[in-house]
């Protein structure tokens, strides 16, 4: 995968309405992005597929939507106030700030070994000078705010850095009201916030992001087999939606780099091919043990254990957590789907064609309805067909420009099918359906078109 592919995706995203720079009319906000008409559809399709796979297609997982701002005591008990920090270093030459661990990891990935003298061996990625980094200091990743009319220590609150803690604090209520018993899971999607030192790489690392997390509660001693199970499930979800396995790998966190709550964490990494780093974390599957439930039980004085009626014993569940970022998943699917091939134009000459070979379940637009030309007879018929199909799918109507150019526009945004209403339609009540990847065309009767598309858009 070429290193400049990210730049191509950034350009395509802005030009076609997937992702825009935030507050661009004011010069932009660093590492903040707004999702345009196509981007929000792709993002919602991703979330819908995750929810269907992780929640509604299973009997052992239920959903939750907890608050973004939790009681500050939650973050003290969870360990985030004390330990949710990153090592911050500054280049004394250009005064750019970086995460020290990211600099060392990039060096190790490139050289195959850690720097012998730490930061002293590293060149600044910004100015190129060597040995100019300050001694790292711990920098809090929590974003804080104040609630109420006064701004003092008693009004401090935190924007959640993960959705997980809202699940843990609601564990007992969800378990009781849903009448579930371990092993079972609680899933949640929502916005989280982290005061990143070095956000960047488009939508990969941002201070405001959306998560898809599930906490799966199991009996202690059964946690390791369940972690293996969820690692396989999460890998299969990505490949099932089209990610190629040659662009994916597992990364096991070494013991010294595990989070404060983790017994074991394995990341699915994707070949993003960022400048200076080929691989990046796509999703983590962590064994959080009973750390969170035990910590909150101790701090709150509430019982968060589970009484096992069959074994007649009480225990605190261990937790397996698959945690994914919506933005990272979207970026991976865009990169993997993007191809350039050749297709004949109206004169039969081969021209470059840009295609997003997205799985139809993810495609922002499922079907484009295209009248062959702007015509008082064709346009109303095409608009009527588009409106009828909108009852089932997201449909785009386009009658501007040559038909070949309109096909290319749809290929570029990943639309799986184009339906052309032509002059023959007025006589035979049939339309031409063009498939995106093969460009094959098939004549389909109007009274069968809905069933034809439905059989090819299963799960959409």
Swiss-Prot record:
<dbReference type="GO" id="GO:0004820">
    <property type="term" value="F:glycine-tRNA ligase activity"/>
</dbReference>
<dbReference type="Pfam" id="PF00587">
    <property type="entry name" value="tRNA-synt_2b"/>
</dbReference>
<dbReference type="GO" id="GO:0005524">
    <property type="term" value="F:ATP binding"/>
</dbReference>
<keyword id="KW-0067">ATP-binding</keyword>
<feature type="binding site">
    <location>
        <begin position="204"/>
        <end position="209"/>
    </location>
    <ligand>
        <name>ATP</name>
    </ligand>
</feature>
<dbReference type="GO" id="GO:0005737">
    <property type="term" value="C:cytoplasm"/>
</dbReference>
<protein>
    <recommendedName>
        <fullName>Glycine--tRNA ligase</fullName>
        <ecNumber>6.1.1.14</ecNumber>
    </recommendedName>
</protein>
<dbReference type="InterPro" id="IPR036621">
    <property type="entry name" value="Anticodon-bd_dom_sf"/>
</dbReference>
<feature type="binding site">
    <location>
        <begin position="325"/>
        <end position="328"/>
    </location>
    <ligand>
        <name>ATP</name>
    </ligand>
</feature>
<comment type="subunit">
    <text>Homodimer.</text>
</comment>
<feature type="binding site">
    <location>
        <begin position="194"/>
        <end position="196"/>
    </location>
    <ligand>
        <name>ATP</name>
    </ligand>
</feature>
<feature type="binding site">
    <location>
        <begin position="281"/>
        <end position="282"/>
    </location>
    <ligand>
        <name>ATP</name>
    </ligand>
</feature>
<feature type="binding site">
    <location>
        <begin position="209"/>
        <end position="213"/>
    </location>
    <ligand>
        <name>substrate</name>
    </ligand>
</feature>
<dbReference type="InterPro" id="IPR022961">
    <property type="entry name" value="Gly_tRNA_ligase_bac"/>
</dbReference>
<feature type="binding site">
    <location>
        <position position="99"/>
    </location>
    <ligand>
        <name>substrate</name>
    </ligand>
</feature>
<dbReference type="InterPro" id="IPR045864">
    <property type="entry name" value="aa-tRNA-synth_II/BPL/LPL"/>
</dbReference>
<keyword id="KW-0436">Ligase</keyword>
<dbReference type="InterPro" id="IPR004154">
    <property type="entry name" value="Anticodon-bd"/>
</dbReference>
<dbReference type="GO" id="GO:0006426">
    <property type="term" value="P:glycyl-tRNA aminoacylation"/>
</dbReference>
<dbReference type="InterPro" id="IPR033731">
    <property type="entry name" value="GlyRS-like_core"/>
</dbReference>
<keyword id="KW-0648">Protein biosynthesis</keyword>
<dbReference type="InterPro" id="IPR006195">
    <property type="entry name" value="aa-tRNA-synth_II"/>
</dbReference>
<dbReference type="Pfam" id="PF03129">
    <property type="entry name" value="HGTP_anticodon"/>
</dbReference>
<comment type="function">
    <text>Catalyzes the attachment of glycine to tRNA(Gly).</text>
</comment>
<dbReference type="InterPro" id="IPR002315">
    <property type="entry name" value="tRNA-synt_gly"/>
</dbReference>
<dbReference type="GO" id="GO:0046983">
    <property type="term" value="F:protein dimerization activity"/>
</dbReference>
<keyword id="KW-0547">Nucleotide-binding</keyword>
<keyword id="KW-0963">Cytoplasm</keyword>
<dbReference type="InterPro" id="IPR027031">
    <property type="entry name" value="Gly-tRNA_synthase/POLG2"/>
</dbReference>
<dbReference type="InterPro" id="IPR002314">
    <property type="entry name" value="aa-tRNA-synt_IIb"/>
</dbReference>
<keyword id="KW-0030">Aminoacyl-tRNA synthetase</keyword>
<feature type="binding site">
    <location>
        <begin position="321"/>
        <end position="325"/>
    </location>
    <ligand>
        <name>substrate</name>
    </ligand>
</feature>
<feature type="binding site">
    <location>
        <position position="162"/>
    </location>
    <ligand>
        <name>substrate</name>
    </ligand>
</feature>
<comment type="similarity">
    <text>Belongs to the class-II aminoacyl-tRNA synthetase family.</text>
</comment>
């Amino acid at each position: 995968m070429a290193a400049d592919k990210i730049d191509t995706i950034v350009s395509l995203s802005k030009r076609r309405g997937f992702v825009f720079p935030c507050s661009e009319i004011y010069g932009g906000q660093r590492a903040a992005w707004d999702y345009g008409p196509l981007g929000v559809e792709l993002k919602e399709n991703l979330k819908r597929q995750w929810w269907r796979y992780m929640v509604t297609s299973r009997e052992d997982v239920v959903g939750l939507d907890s608050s973004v701002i939790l009681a500050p005591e939650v973050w003290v008990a969870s360990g985030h106030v004390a330990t949710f920090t990153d090592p911050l270093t500054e280049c004394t030459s250009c005064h750019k700030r970086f995460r020290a661990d990211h600099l060392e990891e990039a060096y190790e990935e490139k050289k195959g070994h850690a720097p012998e003298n730490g930061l002293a061996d590293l060149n600044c990625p910004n100015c190129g000078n060597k040995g100019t980094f300050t001694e790292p200091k711990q920098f809090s990743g929590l974003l804080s705010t104040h609630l109420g009319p006064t701004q003092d220590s008693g009004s401090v609150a935190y924007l959640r850095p993960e959705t997980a803690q809202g699940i843990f604090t609601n564990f007992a209520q969800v378990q009781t009201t849903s009448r579930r018993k371990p092993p079972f899971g609680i899933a949640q999607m929502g916005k989280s916030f982290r005061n990143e030192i070095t956000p960047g790489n488009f939508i990969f690392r941002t201070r405001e992001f959306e998560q898809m997390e599930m906490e799966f509660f199991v009996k202690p001693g059964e946690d390791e087999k369940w972690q293996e199970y969820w690692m396989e499930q999460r890998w299969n979800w990505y490949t099932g939606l089209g990610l190629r396995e040659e662009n994916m790998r597992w990364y096991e966190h070494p013991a010294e780099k595990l989070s404060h709550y983790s017994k074991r964490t394995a990341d699915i990494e994707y070949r993003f091919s960022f400048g200076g780093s080929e691989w990046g974390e796509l999703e983590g599957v962590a064994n959080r043990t009973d750390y969170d439930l035990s910590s909150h039980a101790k701090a709150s004085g509430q019982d968060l254990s589970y009484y096992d009626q069959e074994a007649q014993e009480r225990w605190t569940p261990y937790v397996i957590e698959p945690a994914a970022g919506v933005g990272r998943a979207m970026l991976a699917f865009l990169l993997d789907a993007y191809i350039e091939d050749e297709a004949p134009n109206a004169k039969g000459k081969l021209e470059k064609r840009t295609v997003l070979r997205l799985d139809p379940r993810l495609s922002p637009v499922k079907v484009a309805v295209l009248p062959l030309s702007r015509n008082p007879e064709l346009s109303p018929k095409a608009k009527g067909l588009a409106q009828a199909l909108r009852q089932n799918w997201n449909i785009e109507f386009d009658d501007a420009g040559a038909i070949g150019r309109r096909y290319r526009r749809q290929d570029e945004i990943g639309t799986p099918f184009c339906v052309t209403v032509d002059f023959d339609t007025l006589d035979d009540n049939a339309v031409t359906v063009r498939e995106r990847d093969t460009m094959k065309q098939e004549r389909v009767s109007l009274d069968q078109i809905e069933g034809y598309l439905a059989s090819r858009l299963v799960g959409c």
